[in-house]
């Protein structure tokens, strides 16, 4: 199956409505990952088909969980997941990509320019040291244990905001270790077409 068809079929299977223009931009992002991977060590994946599944479709499972938000922070963004695919599909949301690895943030800056993402800002630094970002939703994909994630990023969450942590298997133990002042709003299993692995999203808020 041609890559454009594979992406379109995956998006349709997920019940998402994403324009042709946005889909083309998502594939341009995959091209950038492939182009700069050796220089910046962005992903262990080399196969384009797997990149579409793991980096695009997996990231797009976040979209239904950021309806109505105006600002989002992607912590430990790495090569830009889930932040860049989200930014492509939601140009109305101001998104900050944060990573401590300067090689990764150099790539992110390049990607933002080449993809024309006017709604994205890239910040280089450790999350605990960042103080000039406030977001309606703070997200991450495979970044840290939930308790550490909320502890390190609580000061970056707007009043009334929430965390959206993208995880693999159901994180029962991690949920049990969350601090008392954090409320688990929802844990939802995510279905990623073509991915033979468990995925969950954990929505958390301050009590």
From Swiss-Prot:
Molecular function terms from GO: rRNA (guanine-N7-)-methyltransferase activity
Top-tier EC class: transferase
EC number(s) from the headed UniProt entry: 2.1.1.170
Keyword rRNA processing carried by entry: yes
Keyword Transcription regulation attached: no
Domain of life: Bacteria
Subcellular locations according to the entry: Cytoplasm
A GO cellular-component term linked to this record: cytosol
Record's keyword terms, sorted: Cytoplasm, Methyltransferase, rRNA processing, S-adenosyl-L-methionine, Transferase
TM stretches of this protein: none
InterPro entries: rRNA_ssu_MeTfrase_G (IPR003682), SAM-dependent_MTases_sf (IPR029063)
Catalytic activity, as annotated: guanosine(527) in 16S rRNA + S-adenosyl-L-methionine = N(7)-methylguanosine(527) in 16S rRNA + S-adenosyl-L-homocysteine
Family: Belongs to the methyltransferase superfamily. RNA methyltransferase RsmG family.
Protein name: Ribosomal RNA small subunit methyltransferase G
Gene, per the UniProt record: rsmG
